[in-house]
Design a protein with these regions (language model features):
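N-terminal pre-Walker A segment at the start of P-loop NTPase domains
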Residues: 1-14
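Conserved catalytic/coupling elements of P-loop NTPase cores
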Residues: 11, 20-154
Length: 154
């Protein structure tokens, strides 16, 4: 997981509605929860590790604490969710009715996964208010190195 996956949500979380309207009306004093959801085991480990649930059984709905109701929830690697977990996440998002600010990350294009039938279109549009496509870290470092060399020559 690259640094942007961690740093961008940390920047967005404290911003007030009038500073950055698309991130919602939540204050910086609300809870910020990060969950790596790359696999079911990681979801359970993340939620249990944070003390949010005591256990999570397959087939049960994804339940997050009421504290997350008015905070920021970052979901890392949302593109790797199984179909069943996508349905659960969509149901939770529908139930939360916009009280929770959700930031999700994916290492692959979610739109391409929708087109391939691997990701729910409705969940894609529910999550995709603002999309940022960031080059892999290796490409960013390479471009930064080239820019540094060009500046030295001038």
């Amino acid at each position: 997981m690259n640094r942007l996956n961690h740093s961008l949500p940390n920047v967005l979380h404290p911003m007030a509605h009038d500073e950055f309207p698309f991130v919602g009306i939540l204050s910086a004093n609300t809870l910020f929860i990060g969950v790596n959801i790359a696999s079911r085991d990681r979801v359970e480990a993340s939620l249990v590790g944070l003390g949010l649930v005591s256990r999570w059984e397959p087939g049960e709905p994804l339940v997050l604490p009421s504290a997350a109701d008015t905070g920021t929830l970052i979901l890392h690697e949302v593109g790797s969710l199984t179909h069943d977990d996508q349905v659960r996440l969509l149901a939770w998002l529908d139930q939360s009715a916009g009280r929770t600010r959700v930031v999700s990350t994916a290492s692959a294009s979610l739109f391409a996964r929708v087109e391939a039938g691997l990701f729910l279109e409705r969940l894609y549009y529910r999550l995709n208010t603002v999309s940022l496509n960031v080059a892999p870290g290796s490409e960013i470092r390479s471009a930064a190195g080239a820019a540094k060399q060009a500046n030295k020559r001038q």
